[in-house]
Amino acid sequence: MTQTTRVVAGIASVAAGTALAIWSTRDLREAKRTRAPGKHVAAARAFNHGSALLALSVLADSAMEHYRGSFENRAMYLPPVVALCSLGAALHGGADQRAASHRLRHAIQICGAATGATGTAFHLYNVTKRPGGLSWHNLFYGAPAGAPFALVLSGVLGAIAEQLRDEPEHDPQLFGMPAGKALALVAGAGLLGTAAEAALLHFRGSFQHPAMYAPVTIVPVGGALLAHAALAPARHAARASAFARLWLRLTAALGFAGLGFHANGVARAQGGWRNWSQNLFAGPPLPAPPSFSALALAGLAALRMRETER
């Protein structure tokens, strides 16, 4: 891959991320402009979009990593299957404009979150049972403890989207607080969690490329700004939301730019993409960076919802 090709790929990735961030919240912007009903449905659909992107990331990642592990444990077949079901449910929800939840979709997403939580426990057990127990070496080279958590987030976003559809249009509530505020806090916490996993793996890689600092700086700041915008008093709300929205669009673009960087990492390995069957497993994980974009899209939807509440 030549230097020119890499630059073009990076620009295309950033453009794709920005376009997806704007596209995902178009229903919310239209609802706000026309004052039409259904703002909470538009937010629910945006959360479905984020859930779908996370499920796709988990599907690709778990299928590759568990295949590399030769599916030694039969339970290793479960995450790809559940992620595929979650992806289907999220895509169906993203296309559904009805202000009513779907029981099957809701059940699938709850099942996905439960499967992700169980997988996190299994991965932590795998790390602690290795010689040396809980150590940096085992965290680096054992089963990635944060990987199944993406399935938890996908299920949570999808389940919240279904619950939001059943809330009244004039005053939707989640977890005992205004829906926009609750959605922003959930998305912000998800961004901080995914940034922590990226920090661990990039620390393992000794931050050998300056771009490896981006996920551990841009993404946590996005999560903090989102939480601040959710909790800010009314007199500071507009400014906080505007700055957080700008930063979240940058975060969404970063996810796709990271995909380009990881693809470049695979290309630079011995044999490049011609030796894809080995380098895809040995190189940086391609499905990981889009999880930032998924949570940024959810955060943008939450901010739009929060603005209508104020």
Model-based region annotation:
Residues 1-310:
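Short amphipathic, positively biased membrane-proximal segments
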